[in-house]
Amino acid sequence: EYPDIDFTQPNHHFVLKATDLKSIVSQTAFACSDKDQRPVLTGVNFNSQGNMLYCSGTDSYRLARKTIELDSSQDFNITIPSKSLTEVVRSVSDEDTIDIFADSKKAQFVFDKTIIQTRLIDGTFPDVQRIIPTSCVSKMLVDSYEIAGTIDRTNFIRNDKVHLIKLECSQTETHIKTYSSEIGNSDEVLTKCEYEGEEISLTCNGTYMLDAIKALGCEKVLIEFSGFMKPIKVSNPEDASVLMILVPIRSYD
């Protein structure tokens, strides 16, 4: 016998354009964890404060956040499974408007005579606001295609299956280096780069950097450094609604 499903409408209600929800999912879900040790990290957190909706995905090593302005003031904090969100955006058309209802247990997505309901993830989502840098000691504006291509070319050079890249940045040159005792090394200079601030040298996960650049989907990327071994901010200089944060890794040399 097919089980009874409770489709009682939750009390919190807000409306999103389908294109906005698609942007939220494409720019945050990739950063969610794919491991079940901390279930709350496998979902996208929707945190509404007033009429601002902050959507965040993190696996504790990186953060992706998208901010959307709502038509009405709301106050809720829920975490929706990233897989459920992916299924929703596959089902909607760009022209759709989505009514979203939520409480502490479930969320409903209502559009075009369709209801998609999902359970929420229990647990407290981490306070990601505290890792977002509020200032920087240096920054660089780079061509997205050049830096993505440079990182992608070195993807086969790995340490313990992790693709590490070292950024050596100055006002003279910006190098992207990789090294593996078993495979070899590479060193490329970015030719389309505008750099400001003090010199800095940091190692980070190249796969995470590439994911962030691809998710931003812009021609130029702004990379801001807040200091040695401090979080790296990656953003679209023409769109303040989305940002990516990467946690540096202890250097291999």
What are these language model-derived features?
Residues E1-D253:
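Structural preference for solvent-exposed beta-strand-turn elements
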